[in-house]
């Protein structure tokens, strides 16, 4: 959660990036046309000036009726009877429809774009070729404005994934993940992790975004909490020097409304349960920028999967902490009858909508909320005891840094001193197919960064100097002034995007490309 220092209201947006955005679209369309000529009729994709090609191109797209149809368009979302917001959604609803796939069974999807802006649709957490993954930086063709694109792919891996826009928003709070373009995906596994009676999907999302100045991000919920003194000194010195030069704090984004499954607390249908029932909650943090928490008074969550991947050590916790784009699958045994609020720990956010009512059969009345005791979120809790991760073939050192208010009042972000160039889109790291790599990430800022790797999953192997293993994810929260190590096998040829999943960070430089040959 961001605690704003000073709000700008009404919103005074910084100078627009429309001209830059138009230039980028034109360049990418040019590259797309070039790829069509180069590939002589094969599936369209972008060809970049790198050593890699679209070696893992998508499957031939069959004719006939699609298995699924997704339509991006403007709509009104009724968060509450007296609070209706305009935004862009899938199929006229928020969240987008739940898509259930079978692992290994090809699907055909028609994606319609009824907006005035070329769009991208990213299949988050799946191992897909670059021309369907849904990132322009990798080479995925745009879905043209008022146009359509049909794609075919084989879903995988099994588990809880999701789909969302992957458009640069910059200073436009109607675009990208500030919009309602997000929906859940569940790829049926051969065997479910844990026994349960039924499942419930929850998508957490904020609405009515606005710009604010400065603010501090709470991070005392993360464990281990040890900070690296060298990183802290570097980050704090850079901030002090910036402020001493008269620079204000960089823009942040806040929100006025909060919802679960598109309804503010108390304005949607409750989750109706029976005593003794075991409910598997699949929780998606669909936020553009926020870290969320959830608690259900009198109950515990048995976490069985993170980001759709079964954990080695399922464990009960009183609170879920979920970074931007993370997913948690947890079983709750209903053994405390009553009417309760399943909600965020932040009182302001919960009172403004971030909650849903859990109603036991035979019980009525005002939903109750009881704040839980302080609890630290630690990925190691779900790890393999005494895990000894396989030694990598190579280690890639990465340092993340913030340049306060450096881009028209917005914070700019760098990886190893380089701000990602949306015009050039050059790979920073070169990989060999089949090799195992360790990303050693050093965070020289006080922000938490939910780090995401496209087209792969990774194993968390060290957090703040503490070894661990066995937890497989595609997004992981890296604490302020902390280090984290994650291992992955470069088994996807071509370009792979790596970035902080906070829209405000990735739009201003916090991205890098891997090129695997």
Where are these regions (language model features)?
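Terminal connector regions
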Residues: 171, 338-359, 501-510
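N-terminal secretory signal peptides
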Residues: 1-29, 33
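C-terminal soluble interaction/assembly domains
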Residues: 461-491
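N-terminal export signals
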Residues: 8-9, 29-50
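C-terminal structural cap/anchor segments
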Residues: 396, 403-406, 415, 420-446
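Active/binding-pocket-proximal capping segment
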Residues: 297-310, 416-418, 444-471, 503-507, ...
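Histidine-centered copper-binding motifs that mark active-site loops
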Residues: 24, 34, 47-324, 330, ...
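A structural feature that tracks compact, well-ordered secondary-structure segments
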Residues: 282-286, 292-297, 331-333, 341-347, ...
